[in-house]
Amino acid sequence: MTEGKAEKPVVESFQLDHTKVKAPYVRYIDTETGPHGDVISNYDLRLTQPNKQAIPTGGLHTIEHTIAVLLRERIPGYIDCSPFGCRTGFHLLTWGTHSTEDVAKALKESLEFIAYKATWDDVPATTEKSCGNYRDHSLFAAKEWAKQILEEGISSDPFERKVV
């Protein structure tokens, strides 16, 4: 930086070497402690290999809506699960900390439901009133991508395949 200017914040995900990871995986990113001692953890739920594949928005959007319910049922302290702009996965935020193995198992169970059991009735918030882009959903694409991700296996480690 030039003299007199503040240092720019470091964005962790921009520091990750995306050429070294082996998707699909769950990666623990960081834990933040708030002013009252509350702990929030951030996880990288990477579903596809960066710079090789990206999930089309309709499928990703449907996965997002569906796992919003499914992961809440499986992960205590679930706060939010938001898609990456690159469409290769999600950030998961939780109160407290969880092992990557537990998060990977919860993700696997959720994707199994999407791939093999979900019907349109299982996808929440798909109306104009409840969704900001309700026309951009595809249960077919969500199911096909979930099957592919499950076939590849979800690892609890981003660099070494430890499939759960």
Swiss-Prot record:
Binding site for Fe cation: H61, H65, C131
PANTHER family for the chain: S-RIBOSYLHOMOCYSTEINE LYASE
Catalyzed chemical reaction(s): S-(5-deoxy-D-ribos-5-yl)-L-homocysteine = (S)-4,5-dihydroxypentane-2,3-dione + L-homocysteine
Protein name: S-ribosylhomocysteine lyase
Family the entry assigns: Belongs to the LuxS family.
Enzyme kind, highest EC tier: lyase
BP-aspect Gene Ontology terms: quorum sensing
Subunit structure: Homodimer.
EC numbers on record: 4.4.1.21
A Pfam family it matches: LuxS
Superkingdom assignment: Bacteria
Keyword terms of this UniProt record: Autoinducer synthesis, Iron, Lyase, Metal-binding, Quorum sensing
InterPro entries: LuxS_sf, Metalloenz_LuxS/M16, S-ribosylhomocysteinase
Cofactor stoichiometry and binding remark: Binds 1 Fe cation per subunit.
NCBIfam families for the chain: PRK02260.2-3, PRK02260.3-1
UniProt KW Lipoprotein keyword: no
Function: Involved in the synthesis of autoinducer 2 (AI-2) which is secreted by bacteria and is used to communicate both the cell density and the metabolic potential of the environment. The regulation of gene expression in response to changes in cell density is called quorum sensing. Catalyzes the transformation of S-ribosylhomocysteine (RHC) to homocysteine (HC) and 4,5-dihydroxy-2,3-pentadione (DPD).
Single annotated GO MF: S-ribosylhomocysteine lyase activity
Cofactor section: Fe cation
